[in-house]
Amino acid sequence: MGRKPCCEKVGLRRGPWTSEEDQKLVSHITNNGLSCWRAIPKLAGLLRCGKSCRLRWTNYLRPDLKRGIFSEAEENLILDLHATLGNRWSRIAAQLPGRTDNEIKNYWNTRLKKRLRSQGLDPNTHLPLEDSKLDDTEDDTDDEGGDSSDVTMSDASKSEKRSKKKSKPKETVKVRQPKGPKPAPQLKMCQSDEGPVLLKVPKAPKSPISVNPGPGCNYDDDSEHSSSSTVTTKSHEDHRDSSDFIKALTSVSSFPEAELWSCIKPITNSFSSTALLSEWDSYRAFDSSLFPSSYPQLNSGLPKLEDVNSKSSAVASPVQGMLPAYNPMGMEMQTRMQFSSQLTHEIGQNYGGIFQETCYPQPDMGMSWSMHAELSHCGTESLFATPNPANAPSNFEEVPQPSPCTTSQELQRLAALLDLI
């Protein structure tokens, strides 16, 4: 904040003082003495500001002022004081009684400064000037005004300040950049004895295995925002092997799928479709013992998958909960029998579903497998067979027997389903 102004300067006079104003100011100060300069104009009846009254009294109306030319002793004193104090005219005027600072400054610029230059001395430092700088300084003095050099500080002091500024190294200010907000931890709802609990889900580690799903799969992995990943298949890739889908599904760096697959993968790689079929046939005797004695033809043994493709017989359209009875002697397919509650309890609902869906060819479903068709089928009805009501009608229809060339496709489908399980 600057200095408070001496007055509002509204309705005040400016310009040179008149003799009447000088008389009012002198009479007031001689009668009342010096006081606050802001209050003197009102007390003396002047339309002037306090600063104007102070300067008029100090420089012109003061009774102890000296008028006339400076003496030689005063000139020598001014030169000595300027060599030590510089352009501090008010302090120099304090050493010369009866002389004002403005009067001393004007006398220095008009007389004493030129005298020093004529003697070969620098007026700012009072030291001898070099011959090379003498002409330059004389040209500068001709262009300078009377009061411009008096107001500013000496060149020596300026040069000293410049050298100090250059010597000081610039301080580097470290600016702290704010960090962005941390992402919120991922939570997962888990059931416990006390109730539902929210647990933090650890960040999934990046898998070193690179996934190339190909045109049939769209792979989307966003490990920064979600711990799960999605793999979608297109239905137009009907004849694509299911192992590619399983590879893409299990190679995704998700948690806990990737950890689970790392444990299961060595076991599944050791299996082959031929070994699985041979192991399936080895359990036929055990499976036949589960059927009750009321079905003697089922106890005689279950047919093999190769025999089903080679036999030319009428196959009924499969219905959930129904198991076709096959005559091993080469006879026609017998009437479809319904599972009783005891049979369903002994054999198991899952076993009946897997046996029906995998061991017998389906006339209403194509041999080529697609994920889209499998998902659409699961949306309407269960994959596993359920027992039919006792009064369900048995409709038979004659369908063409699939050719033996489709056996390899059925084996691939069976292997893919076992891998998924």
UniProtKB/Swiss-Prot annotation:
Gene encoding this polypeptide?
PP2
Q: Which UniProt keywords apply?
A: Activator, DNA-binding, Nucleus, Repeat, Transcription, Transcription regulation
The subcellular location is: Nucleus
- Organism of this sequence: Physcomitrium patens
Bias (Acidic residues): 136-147
The record's section on SMART domains has: SANT
Where in this protein does the record put region Disordered? 119-240
Which positions carry the signal peptide feature in this UniProt record? none
Q: What does this protein do?
A: Possible transcription activator.
What is the protein's name according to its record? Answer: Myb-related protein Pp2
Q: What is the lineage of its organism?
A: Eukaryota, Viridiplantae, Streptophyta, Embryophyta, Bryophyta
Q: Does the keyword Transcription apply?
A: yes
Q: Which terms under GO biological process does the entry name?
A: regulation of DNA-templated transcription
